[in-house]
Amino acid sequence: MFMIIGLQVGFSSNSEEGKKEIADTIFVNGKVYTVEKQQPWAEAVAISNGKIIYVGNNTCAKAYKGNKTKVIDLKGKMMLPGFIDNHLHASGTANLLFTVQLKGAQTLEEYVQRVKAYDEQHPGATVIQGHGWSNTIFPSASPNKAALDAVVNDIPVALRSEDFHSLWVNSKALEIAGITKDTPNPEGGVIERNQDGEPSGTLRETAQNLVLNTLPSFSVNEYKEALHYFQSFANKNGYTQVKHILVENQENIVQALTALEKEQALTIRHNLTFAIQPSEGESRIPYLKEQRNNLQGQLVKGNGAKLFMDGVM
């Protein structure tokens, strides 16, 4: 399958009347799926200055050829319009680059050993964060703080589940967050507890924020690096636009994206949706209006809000 990233898709008339714009690149002999009712399939595409100026047949595409035009023979391969992902957490790539990776481990022991190894490799760390544990590894119970306390008990450990809806923490993280047996469940969240009522070490949904809000956020530069990494992946897989769901560290993420836009380092469109926690309610509206007004660039736009009202199964 052959994919191309295009910034604008349109159809040019097949008429040869008038002067044609000269293309930088022309693709011919392809199976081009256009997603247009009047012409769902084509065999040629012409591009000039990063924009698609013609979609149609091989013969008419020749009218856009100049002395320096590059012609690429697709040899029957498929070409698709750019993909749009309407719900993702691209900034979460920072978790992939800068924290303990638990994905792929098959047992509790493997999880714990990865945390222990990270602690040994980062002797100056003030916190250990990680991502990727699966609820399926704990079929009869939730992750417990005791397993983490056995390897790291002097600094907080906070490990996100693979779906980002649960947080596994050690006793130090609970202590710093002030979570005790008397702490009530926050609206929209659950503090799981042992039989004696003490927090067990698993926080579900909005209860995660009780610990996450006490941890240092990724820096603007770390988010810039993470977004570069994400864009590289997106480009290779044919994505031209994404909708970010921003939950925590919104300011740093916005600063990273706007800085990259000013540096002309963005290669896809980024639409931003800001999450609102149940406890925030209408107090968040002025902030959302401000972001909508400020974020109206060519490649970065603030145009949505996410109301968090449920959980996952």
Residue ranges with predicted function:
Residues 293-296:
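Accessory "access/gating" subregions that flank catalytic or transport cores
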Residues 11, 18-28, 33, 37-287, ...:
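Divalent metal-binding segments
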Residues 1-8:
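Bacterial N-terminal signal peptides
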